[in-house]
């Protein structure tokens, strides 16, 4: 599928281009982007403070609607077409993108602008849980 995507070269520019998005894998979903949060790391990539690969697609705090479900996820109750999902770690500065199983969570169909950042932050917190003997 051809879709638009946006990336930066690290020279304070944003490039819009077309992308041949691959089909989602068997444990992936395809997401139609509704909103994407702009993270501090996205700003650092834009300004050049954080080195990026050439044409690296940015965006990792997305919210969208599921448009396709991989065969391994169909019928599992995890997610279905039409569900709202919050995603993390995916190149969500695009009209459509794929999200791997484990990188998305189903969210209620409410006004998306109120949920994307809290969900993304919550996921990041869960992934960086303080362990025994950590200094705080």
Regions found by a protein language model. Name each.
Residues 6-14:
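Extracellular beta-rich ligand/substrate-recognition surface
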Residues 16, 21, 63-65, 96-98, ...:
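Conserved hydrophobic/aromatic beta-strand scaffold that supports enzyme active sites
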